[in-house]
Structure formats: C-alpha cells, structure tokens
Amino acid sequence: MIVMSLTNEQIIEAIASKSVSEIVELISAMEEKFGVSAAAVAAAAPAAGAAAAEEKTEFDVVLKAAGANKVAVIKAVRGATGLGLKEAKDLVESAPANLKEGVSKEEAESLKKELEAAGAEVEIK
C-alpha cells in the first residue's frame, strides 16, 4: 500500500472543488471517523470572538442633575416617561436617577437632547 502525503493546500483545493452535498457527506464521515461534532466547534468559535467585538445596542438614560429650571425638567421627564407629576418630581429631585433603561441608541440620544434643552444634565450609559 502506497501512502501519499497531501499538503493542507491540496486538501483545501480538493474540498473547494466539491459540491455542497459532497462537503456535507465529507463532514458527516469525518464526524463519525473522529467522534466529534462540527456543529459544536462552529458554534463555540464565533461566540468567543463576537463577544469582544459586540457593539452595545441597549443604553440607559441617567438624569445626573435637574439644573436651574427644575419645572421644565419635570415636564420633560413626564413627557418622556409617562410618569405622573408627583412621580416625575420625585425622580428629578432624587437625581442621579435612571430615567429609561435598555433603550435604543437613537431613543437615548433623542431623550438626552430633549432633557438637556430643558436644562437637565443627562448621561447615556
């Protein structure tokens, strides 16, 4: 029996020339031969890399301070959160306080602009 040694490049070229169904058969045969699952390796590899490169999609809007015009800030907080007058007043007076959590970047930016226009100091986390 003559054993020919193939380079990695030759193996890759041979696989590249196969159809999708042939590659699926090859993967199944390799899983059976070596007692492994390609799905487990494929799913675990991107998850590790994706976690580091993942962009933040949910933001918290934090009222840092009410500023000089507390009445305008209370009105803006009521409009943005739907709270009643007393709840909005209590929230503004307890600054720093979370106004909204888990909102989109666009909504957070819009809320920040609205509250800053009323005189509040706002932070997006």
UniProtKB/Swiss-Prot annotation:
Q: Which GO terms describe its cellular component?
A: cytosolic large ribosomal subunit
User: CDD domains, alphabetically?
Assistant: Ribosomal_L7_L12
Q: Name one GO biological process term.
A: translation
InterPro entries, A to Z: Ribosomal_bL12, Ribosomal_bL12_C, Ribosomal_bL12_C/ClpS-like, Ribosomal_bL12_oligo, Ribosomal_bL12_oligo_N_sf
Pfam families in the record: Ribosomal_L12 (PF00542), Ribosomal_L12_N (PF16320)
Going by the UniProt record, its keywords in alphabetical order are:
Ribonucleoprotein, Ribosomal protein
Q: What are the recorded GO MF terms, alphabetically?
A: mRNA binding; structural constituent of ribosome
On whether Amino-acid biosynthesis is a keyword of this UniProt record, the answer is no
Oligomer status and interactors: Homodimer. Part of the ribosomal stalk of the 50S ribosomal subunit. Forms a multimeric L10(L12)X complex, where L10 forms an elongated spine to which 2 to 4 L12 dimers bind in a sequential fashion. Binds GTP-bound translation factors.
What PANTHER family would the database entry show? 39S RIBOSOMAL PROTEIN L12, LARGE RIBOSOMAL SUBUNIT PROTEIN BL12M
Family of the protein in this entry: Belongs to the bacterial ribosomal protein bL12 family.
Role, per record: Forms part of the ribosomal stalk which helps the ribosome interact with GTP-bound translation factors. Is thus essential for accurate translation.
What name goes with this protein? Large ribosomal subunit protein bL12
Organism placement in taxonomy: Bacteria, Pseudomonadati, Pseudomonadota, Gammaproteobacteria, Pasteurellales
